[in-house]
From Swiss-Prot:
Recorded superkingdom: Archaea
Family: Belongs to the TYW3 family.
Any one Pfam family match given in the protein's UniProt record, by short name: TYW3
Gene from which this protein is expressed: taw3-1
Nuclease found in the keyword field: no
EC number: 2.1.1.282
Protein name: tRNA(Phe) 7-((3-amino-3-carboxypropyl)-4-demethylwyosine(37)-N(4))-methyltransferase 1
Species, as recorded: Pyrococcus furiosus (strain ATCC 43587 / DSM 3638 / JCM 8422 / Vc1)
EC class: transferase
Keyword annotations from UniProtKB, A to Z: Methyltransferase, S-adenosyl-L-methionine, Transferase, tRNA processing
Length: 196
């Protein structure tokens, strides 16, 4: 079953948007080869992506993304000094140390294509992958993994944890980054199987 009579048009628009984002430097560099591979497949195209990140964020209260402020954001492993530098910028609200796994949204031409992509992603370690949206206009697969950390570090300019604790959470976060970067490599190595 073909969900979108407009698949080719939607793919063309998504590729134009990606090209603009690439020129502006808005795409995580380490995920670009995977995006290019997915977009080279006849029945798929990417609509958005993040290669996973570690961040330090200040927000009035947890979940208030509208008024949140990045104090540090990295799409790679980080040093304790980088995290401490970000923490020093904290002034008000809650201070959070966060890890988020990679996330990709991929348009699929048919339900069978979407199922094949979800199964491949899960087999590569992206256990939270699913069909995110089905309508007569689009069919979107979300590729997502399990790595995540939400650690309260401080509030209203006061740091609640010591350096030893920070060192440990940075160590754990970096291990998660290594794990999800390996999953991205695995997915990139196996994505061509969808062309068969």
């Amino acid at each position: 079953m073909q969900f979108s009579e407009n698949f080719e048009r939607a793919k063309k628009e998504a590729l134009i948007s990606l090209e603009i984002a690439l020129r502006k430097g808005e795409v995580d560099e380490d995920i670009i080869p995977l995006l290019k591979k997915i977009n080279s497949l006849d029945n798929y195209f990417t609509t958005s992506s993040c290669s996973g990140r570690i961040s330090v964020m200040e927000m009035p209260h947890f979940g208030d993304k509208v008024n949140a402020k990045w104090l540090g954001k990295w799409h790679r492993e980080v040093s304790l000094d980088e995290v401490l530098g970000a923490i020093k910028k904290h002034r008000s609200g809650q201070l959070w140390f966060l890890v988020r796994s990679p996330i990709l949204h991929v348009g699929a031409k048919t339900l069978e294509d979407a199922i094949r992509l979800v199964n491949l992603a899960v087999s590569c370690g992206f256990k939270y992958s699913n069909i995110k949206s089905i309508s007569n206009k689009k069919l979107i697969v979300e590729i997502r993994s399990t790595e995540r950390m939400d650690v309260l570090l401080g509030e209203n300019g006061r740091i609640l944890v010591g350096e030893e604790y920070l060192r440990k959470i940075v160590e754990i976060a970096n291990a998660q980054v290594r794990r999800f970067k390996e999953k991205l490599k695995r997915l990139e190595s196996n994505i061509d199987a969808l062309n068969r």
